[in-house]
């Protein structure tokens, strides 16, 4: 019996949805300890899914793609998974976990990038693929416009996974997740968001790059939460991240005053705050904020995960 445990991830921002330099996308993201995907797997001629997964269809689709690739099945027991379309990257982690399970069981020796290509993941953001292997804070380098000629989300892009260009261990800060019970942007809604918001202004892209290279990454190395928070808050006001936040009207933007280091993950609706103190107070404030707006809100206090997938035989 094989056991795999993967991180979740925050997607902090896409970097360049202007594309005039000859590359598009790029991104920054962070691996988290919780929530997580955990599965057990063993050889089987047919596909058998056990447990009570939230994302049954995603597991079935991933297994079908691997069965088509290698001609074998597997018995997979889902020990833990988490909601899709909330901005925490469950789709990529499920796909990669199932793919790695098949690779390990049948000696396929597939790299994570190869599995991602089989699964059709990582066509816009390379963050999920990178944190699966490495954990930590990751920057990916996007795609050449020779390969990807339009602005599309990963779910609608057939480009290869973006290359990882930087990876740092993240400090031992608390990460507070607030997951309000409202519909995120995925499928056709997400495609439409890209089409109506892109290309973003080049000056926004340049400022995002400046913030990442000269404020955010040094702040991680120096464990300077104040500077990290300043970069993070400004990024919420720029480029495609601004467009993502604005899809929720004033709802998401309105909670950004509740912490000094706060943002929205991916297309939302998950909001995250990073703190070295008072995690409980921030958690309560976020929960109360969404309750006052009429939304139930699940919260999780976790930490960054500075390692990737765990595999036990």
UniProtKB/Swiss-Prot annotation:
pH dependence statement: Optimum pH is 5.3.
Stored Gene3D superfamilies: 3.30.230.10
A GO molecular function held by the record: beta-ribofuranosylaminobenzene 5'-phosphate synthase activity
Domain of life: Archaea
EC class: transferase
A family per Pfam: GHMP_kinases_C
InterPro entries from the UniProt entry: Beta-RFA-P_synthase (IPR053442), GHMP_kinase_C_dom (IPR013750), GHMP_kinase_N_dom (IPR006204), RFAP_synthase (IPR004422), Ribosomal_Su5_D2-typ_SF (IPR020568), Ribsml_uS5_D2-typ_fold_subgr (IPR014721)
Listed pathway(s): Cofactor biosynthesis; 5,6,7,8-tetrahydromethanopterin biosynthesis
EC annotation from Swiss-Prot or TrEMBL: 2.4.2.54
Reaction(s) catalysed (UniProt annotation): 5-phospho-alpha-D-ribose 1-diphosphate + 4-hydroxybenzoate + H(+) = 4-(beta-D-ribofuranosyl)phenol 5'-phosphate + CO2 + diphosphate; 4-aminobenzoate + 5-phospho-alpha-D-ribose 1-diphosphate + H(+) = 4-(beta-D-ribofuranosyl)aminobenzene 5'-phosphate + CO2 + diphosphate
Keywords: Glycosyltransferase, Transferase
Thermal properties of activity per the entry: Optimum temperature is 70 degrees Celsius.
Family of the protein in this entry: Belongs to the beta-RFA-P synthase family.
Functional description taken from the UniProt entry: Catalyzes the condensation of 4-hydroxybenzoate (HB) with 5-phospho-alpha-D-ribose 1-diphosphate (PRPP) to produce beta-ribofuranosylphenol 5'-phosphate (beta-RFH-P). Also catalyzes the condensation of 4-aminobenzoate (pABA) with PRPP to produce beta-ribofuranosylaminobenzene 5'-phosphate (beta-RFA-P).
Subunit text: Homodimer.
PANTHER family: BETA-RIBOFURANOSYLPHENOL 5'-PHOSPHATE SYNTHASE, HOMOSERINE/4-DIPHOSPHOCYTIDYL-2-C-METHYL-D-ERYTHRITOL KINASE
NCBIfam families: beta_RFAP_syn, BetaRFA-P_synth
Name assigned to this protein: Beta-ribofuranosylphenol 5'-phosphate synthase
